[in-house]
Amino acid sequence: MDNYVVLVPGQSEQFLDREETLLWLQSWLNNFDELPYDLACKSSILEASQYLLDTACDLEIKNGFTIQWYAVRLESPDL
């Protein structure tokens, strides 16, 4: 299963699975009046969020405010 750490300026990091990360990205994309140029050609917010998850690791929401996500491996500590 893919896991991601998601970062929002001024907030604590969150660890999400792939589906949760897609929903998280969709919620941010829904706030745009107009999607950025490279996402505007996508047929849906879901397709745009999948494209972002597969090809990028950050998205500028507004000038100076960028969200980030990175794939991580979560492992149980050895005891």
Regions found by a protein language model. Give the residues of each.
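N-terminal prepro regions of secreted peptide precursors
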Residues: 1-35
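Short, compact, well-ordered microdomains
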Residues: 54-79
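Short, hydrophobic/π-rich interface segment
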Residues: 22-56
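Generic marker of "main functional regions" within proteins
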Residues: 11-17, 34-39, 62, 66, ...
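Secondary-structure junction/capping motif
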Residues: 10, 17, 43-44, 71
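Hydrophobic transmembrane signal anchors and adjacent membrane-proximal interface regions, especially
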Residues: 6, 37-41, 70, 74
